[in-house]
């Protein structure tokens, strides 16, 4: 069971929404963003599920900087609106692309999220 989640871009509106939701169900959440980029390696090392939640124009740049650090025993997800940016390749780690069908909310209970297995494994 996943207990430690890292959200890269977790200080933005969507990242904050999911940070609160995960913390409300007792999960540990580590956040990094452009102001705390030095914490990114620690986030990657300690997280079982890594979520990329950055603006579309930064998605590829940030993903390229972290993709070789993600281990096979970790799950990676992007919460980016445009799915063709990252989904055209094969990866050594489990990659589940996600698209929340809602904007920033105080409570995500009952909301829908589209999940797309890009590179599936035991978690999906």
For each feature predicted by the language model, list its residue ranges:
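Phosphate-coordination loops involved in phosphoryl transfer and adenosine-cofactor binding
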Residues: 2-4, 73, 110
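Rossmann-like NAD(P)-binding element
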Residues: 42-67
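Short, conserved loop/helix-junction motifs that constitute active-site signature segments
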Residues: 66-72, 108
């Amino acid at each position: 069971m996943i207990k430690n989640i890292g959200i890269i871009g977790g200080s933005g509106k969507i990242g904050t929404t999911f940070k609160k939701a995960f913390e409300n169900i007792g999960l540990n959440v580590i956040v990094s963003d452009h102001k705390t980029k030095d914490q990114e390696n620690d986030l990657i090392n300690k997280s079982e599920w890594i979520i990329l939640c950055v603006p579309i124009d930064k998605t590829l740049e940030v993903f390229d900087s972290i993709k070789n650090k993600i281990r096979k025993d970790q799950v990676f997800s992007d919460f980016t609106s445009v799915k063709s940016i990252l989904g055209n390749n094969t990866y050594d780690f489990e990659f589940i692309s996600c698209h929340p069908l809602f904007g920033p909310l105080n409570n995500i209970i009952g909301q829908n999220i589209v999940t797309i297995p890009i590179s599936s494994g035991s978690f999906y």
